[in-house]
Amino acid sequence: MKVKEIVLYKVNMRMKNPFTTSFGTQQDRLFLIVEAKSDTGISGWGECVTTELPLYIEEFTQSAWYMLEENLIPLVINEEIDHPDELQEKFNPFKRNNLAKSALEGAIWDLYAKTEGKSLASCLGGVHDTVEVGVSLGIEKNIDDLLKSIKQKSEEGYKRIKVKIKPSKDID
């Protein structure tokens, strides 16, 4: 498959519920979407889940955009890619920047699956129709609100619940 074009989209999404961690409260989520287009008109999609500032890891939205635009995308444009496994070798000269690499790789995997007429799950070797996921809860105002949120998520079927804490907020 030949990758004809890569389009980057910067998306600012308002969160349904503010999410509070020890870094602060997040009302919006800024992230990147990567669209990989083949020479046959098929599009594959990937997501870059950076944060706006490098508070959690060194990679952030603007650095990922730069890494994609200046370094990674030129490696795949107008290139014939037989299988997405080839990408790791292409990306190896660049250290770290794993979220940017993963976003482009995800778009190419999606494009590959669509080109092959298969599900992405089957191309990746998946054997299940469903995947169990967990949920992450932000810091609540008090322990009662936290317990209420945990109960609600448990009733919704989540079996793994991650709880955020911070000094002086985790004592009760």
Please give the residue ranges for each predicted region.
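N-terminal capping/lid subdomain adjacent to the active-site entrance of alpha/beta enzymes
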Residues: 1-172
